[in-house]
Amino acid sequence: MKLIRRDSVGTNPTRLAKIYREIAILREISHPNIVRLHEMVETEKQIGIILEYASGGELFDYILNHRYLKDNAARRLFAQLVSGVGYLHKKGIVHRDLKLENLLLDRNRNIIITDFGFANTFNPDDELGDEIEYNLSSRDFVKRMELDKVLPGGHRRGDLMQTSCGSPCYAAPELVVSDSLYTGRKVDVWSCGVILVSLIPVFGVLN
């Protein structure tokens, strides 16, 4: 159960909106490798998010305790991760904080993607095209094409986003080196690549 004290949110409308967005996203998804939302409870002092229990703990701790994963186990877990992330992207959702600590294991050692605090939504039917994606680092191009314009509904075109978030060790370069627009799906794919490297025994989690 995830408990959020209302006094920790205060009167910050952005923080409160993020919490309700996370809950709304969890209500929309159903996949064997994504955490299930059982219930949301609100009181005057707290907001409670009751989630599926994953008895296997964090994948990060599992790798530390076992030092490495065998090829078949790593392949199976990564396939489950890709399946879950692919499902999210088809639903118009990006996670933006994929990391070993946000991947839990159930009692059968299956991946459970959790922590949607940085997740956001986009229009999966609005494809940007290669020219736009290749020129996102150019402020003149972005301004000329009005890509930084927020459309009705609070989104930009396609999966364009600007908020820098996530965890540095897993973050895509465009999140680290600039404050320009980025494509949310590619940020998730980069994080999946970092996770794959962590699962492969020859590298090890500490790299």
Q: Where would I find each of the regions flagged by the language model?
A:
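Activation segment signature within eukaryotic-like protein kinase domains
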Residues: 77-78
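Protein kinase catalytic-loop region centered on the HRD/HxD motif
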Residues: 81-93
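Conserved N-lobe beta3->alphaC-helix segment of eukaryotic protein kinase catalytic domains
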Residues: 3-29
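Conserved end of the kinase activation segment
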Residues: 156-157, 175-186
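Conserved short submotifs of the Hanks-type protein kinase catalytic core
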Residues: 44-58, 62
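Activation-segment/catalytic-loop signature of the eukaryotic protein kinase fold
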Residues: 40
